[in-house]
Design a protein with these regions (language model features):
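Signal peptide-directed extracytoplasmic domains
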Residues: 1-4, 26-27
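Substrate-binding clefts and substrate-entry loops adjacent to catalytic sites
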Residues: 4-17, 44
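Penicillin-recognizing serine hydrolase domain
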Residues: 20-168
């Protein structure tokens, strides 16, 4: 759910389950980022909401994402268009969750036919951000856009992909 619809409460739950507190989990995230070479990143929460001490770069997001894409489980979620949460002993019905990354949704105007998967994010200070993978003519690219506005969030990524696919 966290990757498909930015369910920030799920991020907090994951952090508390793994590390006891969100602060401790953020320390683990920062440590792992540094191990991946993402040296201009510091996490202070598990969901990305603004904090002066919570920061990253497009390059660092690329490095972190490339590491994730080495995992089959990560790729399965990264490329998922939807997920059905099964019924439990607490909730008797299933719940369908759809990916909110519009470049992946065929019925939307922002759809990009070569997009494989991705993650979006937004808050007032960061603007609209997206990390997206696309494949065309056997070539796979990863694009990170940051600080976009609503009108250009997906156009920015598409323009970058098209430029890179054209000028190998």
């Amino acid at each position: 759910m966290l990757m498909l619809v930015s369910a920030n409460d799920v991020g907090v739950g994951i952090a508390e389950h793994i590390s006891g507190t969100e602060v401790e989990f953020a320390k683990l995230m920062t440590k792992r980022a540094k191990e991946l070479g993402a040296n201009n990143t510091n996490f202070v929460n598990s969901h990305g909401y603004h904090d002066e001490n919570h920061y990253t770069t497009a390059r660092d997001l690329m490095l972190i994402t490339l590491a994730g894409l080495k995992s089959e489980d990560f790729v399965r979620v990264w490329e998922a268009l939807e997920y059905t949460v099964p019924a439990t002993n607490k909730v008797s019905r299933t719940t369908k969750i759809k990916n909110i990354h519009k470049m992946l949704c065929e019925d939307l105007s922002q759809y990009y036919e070569y997009a494989l998967g991705g993650k979006t994010g937004f808050h007032d200070d960061a603007g609209r951000c997206a990390i997206t993978t696309a494949k065309k003519d056997g070539r796979t690219l990863l694009c990170v856009t940051m600080k976009s506005n609503k009108a250009n969030q997906y156009k920015d990524g598409e323009k970058l992909f098209e430029y890179c696919f054209k000028y190998r």
